[in-house]
């Protein structure tokens, strides 16, 4: 056996062997059900970063453990390959985005292979390939047939740089595009939507079933769905009793305190309600607001601006006339596009009232309410009604119900549940996306492409400018087609789908990747779904994860699958952070190579002190670490061990080169340990243990089964990979502290066999190499997970700490079952007591059974 651990010599060799032996090919589950481990598939940028490494290695460990436990494991990989980055890169380089993407996929696949991931590449999918997006189009038509896909004119978020429409979720809190960073504008366009709001209640209620998801993610989804209970209230226009404005409120108990009704600037009633003398100012305000994004308009920090329309409505509870305003903070597609302003009991309404001198009427009384309102604040807590006529004296909860019921009897109110969730906008005016399989006919309207004509294939080799709407509009040979219904000239839909459409069902295709008749069979989905362990970033909590849940529920209702939730357990791994050097006065980052003294770093240009931070790795911050460089220097197993050991999976990980070196040294220790035992072991076949066991054998055997128990526990429910590796270190220490020469052959075999099998999911190449060095005939990854022997955990004796006046002075071995009196007697009779007490009896003895005895002179 080579005395030197050389990862470069063995890792590629074993990867080749595993591929040739089909080690990672997915077997059909013998019991009808397998274990599905899945990482969120990546966009193929062409370059693997450490965030990728962490995600995929975590999933790989879980997959390998489940295989060793005897499960049929599905562990696939694919590529979320459509989208703006590829199209923009193609425009910049004047290349075809398909060719660009395919090259990147090849490059990233080879990088993933170097990590030793146990991926079944036979199931690989790329969303940009027509044999995949054919089925994305097929599923779109299923949703269309079910009334879940529809087209309407809508105010949309327009990215002026990428020149495409963005979903609300793709606009950040500053009103900027999540991709380009441009300030988002508002435009009216005819767009395709998916009716996700039809599933709002199910999406919210079924979060309670997802006990294997982080509470944080479930809370984020619940808040995004945003269930509100209240009432819709009709306010009659004073000058036209046949016209009413419908307002939704969660606080019907404050209705008597309304001082105005506020409409969205683009509410359909604004033009008819506006008085002639207010038309100019209203139209100017409408034009100004149209340039703002929804987030800019609704930000808590933004001023609340509006104009009076000249109209009034009647409060149905007390008949009081209320002015009708329009304001920037009211959105036409949220609720009813109208709100009632109650300045005394809503902080936003209070700010608006203060700006425009509107009345403030308190109608909720509680301790401190009057003082808060007098001080210019709104009292938003419940209380007892005042100034509310017949409802005075009721508490808020009862008043909500009574006022709503009264309004229902009078015909001006109805109890209502609403949701913050909006329908999913999927139209994109770009080229590199899945074509929407619809043909627009002047006579027949929107006609679905017949399923036998799918896929609608993207034309290749076209000129991309990146500007001016969809490039597909310019492809006349592609656009102009006969109507499938009447045969008359018609045009294809030139919008492409949001890339989240492709990623909302890919986990289903992996279950049946070669099916040419349908996207997946019900039988295949039932064998593998739901995904038992899904791993990905917290940034996908609202977008991808919510859309995937919607897709799954919709497809179940269409009769295509039987599962209602796609992912049983979810692990959201933390970010990988690197050291950054930042000049606080300029905000600029300095590359580590330009920092002469990392202990007291200074700006090489100005000499100013730099602040040292740990931040998410990125090129702009000069703190990225190339996985290939780490593998070249230390090997894939060391990279894996570091990324798993440095922090719990869900926490952020701070990169530290010295800790990488530490993991390499640990693997070297295991190499040397096996090397020292190599001459004593020619096979790993178990041998009969001598009885009774020698003390050294018993001690090591107990350490073996403590490790099996602890590592198995760490990999069971709460995935704690870092503490599992700590247990491997403890077992290694237990073996080396005794020494292989002091162990019987049977216990030595058991120790090394167990160590290598526990190590195999974490450092698969090293474990495989050492397994074969010790005589293993098949792969360690097929050797089975070690079985716990509870009897080995039973101790005849334990180490008892002896303290003198609170200071540890040594340990003695005592019977594990000794009681307090026996422990005190053994401690007093020990050499430690004789030395430190010098023949004097202690004034006090403190006994902690099984742990320590403290003798106080």
Curated annotation (Swiss-Prot):
EC numbers for this chain: 6.1.1.4
Protein name as it appears in the record: Leucine--tRNA ligase
Keywords: Aminoacyl-tRNA synthetase, ATP-binding, Cytoplasm, Ligase, Nucleotide-binding, Protein biosynthesis
GO biological process, one term: leucyl-tRNA aminoacylation
Protein family membership: Belongs to the class-I aminoacyl-tRNA synthetase family.
Gene (UniProt): leuS
Motif 'KMSKS' region, chain ranges: 616-620
Location of the protein in the cell: Cytoplasm
Annotated source species: Parasynechococcus marenigrum (strain WH8102)
Reaction(s) the record says it catalyses: tRNA(Leu) + L-leucine + ATP = L-leucyl-tRNA(Leu) + AMP + diphosphate
Residues involved in ATP binding: 619
Record-level Gene Ontology MF annotations: aminoacyl-tRNA deacylase activity; ATP binding; leucine-tRNA ligase activity
GO cellular-component term (any): cytosol
Family annotation (Pfam families): Anticodon_1 (PF08264), tRNA-synt_1 (PF00133), tRNA-synt_1_2 (PF13603), tRNA-synt_1g (PF09334)
Main enzyme class: ligase
């Amino acid at each position: 056996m080579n005395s030197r651990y050389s990862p470069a010599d063995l890792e590629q060799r074993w990867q080749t062997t595993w591929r040739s032996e089909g080690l990672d090919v997915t077997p059909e589950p013998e019991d009808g059900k397998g274990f599905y481990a899945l990482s969120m598939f990546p966009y193929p940028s062409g370059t693997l970063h450490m965030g990728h490494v962490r995600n995929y290695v975590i999933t790989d460990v879980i997959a390998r453990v489940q295989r060793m436990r005897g499960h049929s494991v599905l562990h696939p990989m694919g590529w979320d390959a459509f989208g703006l980055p590829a199209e923009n890169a193609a425009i910049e380089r004047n290349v075809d985005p398909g060719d660009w993407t395919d090259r990147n996929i090849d490059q990233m696949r080879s990088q993933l292979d170097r990590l030793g991931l146990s991926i079944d590449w036979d199931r690989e999918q790329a969303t940009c390939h027509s044999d995949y997006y054919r089925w994305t189009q097929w599923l779109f038509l299923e949703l269309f047939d079910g009334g879940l896909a529809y087209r309407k004119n809508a105010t949309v978020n327009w990215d002026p740089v990428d020149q495409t429409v963005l979903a609300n979720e793709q606009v950040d809190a500053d009103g900027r595009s999540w991709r380009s960073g441009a300030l988002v504008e508002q435009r009216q366009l005819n767009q395709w939507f998916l009716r996700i709001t039809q599933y709002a209640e199910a999406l919210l209620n079924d979060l309670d079933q997802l006990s294997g998801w982080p509470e944080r993610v479930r809370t984020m989804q619940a808040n995004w769905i945003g269930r509100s209970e209240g009432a819709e209230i009709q306010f009659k226009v004073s000058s036209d009793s046949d016209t009413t404005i419908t307002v939704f409120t969660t606080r019907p108990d404050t209705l008597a305190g309304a001082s105005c009704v506020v409409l969205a600037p683009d509410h359909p009633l604004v033009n008819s309600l506006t008085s002639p003398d207010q038309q100019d100012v209203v139209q100017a305000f409408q034009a100004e607001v149209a340039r703002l994004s929804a987030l800019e308009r609704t930000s808590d920090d933004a001023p609340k601006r509006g104009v009076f329309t000249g109209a009034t409505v009647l409060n149905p509870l007390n008949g009081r006339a209320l002015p009708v305003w329009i304001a920037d903070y009211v959105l036409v597609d949220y609720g009813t596009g109208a709100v009632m302003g109650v300045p005394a009991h809503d902080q936003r309404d209070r700010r608006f009232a203060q700006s425009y001198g509107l009345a403030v009427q308190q109608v909720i009384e509680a301790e401190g309410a009057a003082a808060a309102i007098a001080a210019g604040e709104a009292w938003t807590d419940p209380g007892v009604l005042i100034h509310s006529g017949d409802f005075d004296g009721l508490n808020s909860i009862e008043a909500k119900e009574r006022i709503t019921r009264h309004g229902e009897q009078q015909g001006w109110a109805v109890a209502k549940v609403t949701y913050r969730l909006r329908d999913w906008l999927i139209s994109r005016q770009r080229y590199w996306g899945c074509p929407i399989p619809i043909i627009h006919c002047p006579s027949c309207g929107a006609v679905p492409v017949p399923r036998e004509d799918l896929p609608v294939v993207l034309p290749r080799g076209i000129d991309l400018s990146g500007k001016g709407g969809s490039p597909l509009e310019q492809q006349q040979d592609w656009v102009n087609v006969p109507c499938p219904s009447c045969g008359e000239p018609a045009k294809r839909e030139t919008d492409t789908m949001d890339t989240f459409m492709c990623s909302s069902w890919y986990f289903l295709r992996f279950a049946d990747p070669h099916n040419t008749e349908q996207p997946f069979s019900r039988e295949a989905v039932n064998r593998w779904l739901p995904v038992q362990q899904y791993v990905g970033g917290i940034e996908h909590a609202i977008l991808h994860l919510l859309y995937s849940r919607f897709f799954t529920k919709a497809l179940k209702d269409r009769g295509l699958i039987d599962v209602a939730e796609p992912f049983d357990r979810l692990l959201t791994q933390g970010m990988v952070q690197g050291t950054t050097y930042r000049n606080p006065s300029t905000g600029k980052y300095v590359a580590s190579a330009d920092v002469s003294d990392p202990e007291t770093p200074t700006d090489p240009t100005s000499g100013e002190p730099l602040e040292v931070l740990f931040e998410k790795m990125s090129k702009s911050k000069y703190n990225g670490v190339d996985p290939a460089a780490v593998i070249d220097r230390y090997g894939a197993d060391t990279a894996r061990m570091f990324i798993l050991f440095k922090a719990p999976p869900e926490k952020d990980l701070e990169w530290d080169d010295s800790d990488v070196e530490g993991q390499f040294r640990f693997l070297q220790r295991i190499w040397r340990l096996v090397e020292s035992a190599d001459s004593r072991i020619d096979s790993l076949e178990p041998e009969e243990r001598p009885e009774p066991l020698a003390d050294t054998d018993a001690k090591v055997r107990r350490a073996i089964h403590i490790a099996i128990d602890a590592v198995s526990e760490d990999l069971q429910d709460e995935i704690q990979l870092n503490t599992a590796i700590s247990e491997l270190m403890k077992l290694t220490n237990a073996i080396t502290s005794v020494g292989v020469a002091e162990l019987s052959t049977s216990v030595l075999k058991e120790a090394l066999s167990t160590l290598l099998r526990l190590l195999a999911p974490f450092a698969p190449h090293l474990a495989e190499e050492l397994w074969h060095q010790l005589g293993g005939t098949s792969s360690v990854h097929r050797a089975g997970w070690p079985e716990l022997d509870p009897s080995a955990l039973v101790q005849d004796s334990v180490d008892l700490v002896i303290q003198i006046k609170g200071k540890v002075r040594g340990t003695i071995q005592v019977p594990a079952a000794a009681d307090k009196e026996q422990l005190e007697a053994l401690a007093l009779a020990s050499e430690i007591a004789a030395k430190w007490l010098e023949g004097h009896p202690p004034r006090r003895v403190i006994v902690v059974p099984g742990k320590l005895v403290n003798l106080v002179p």
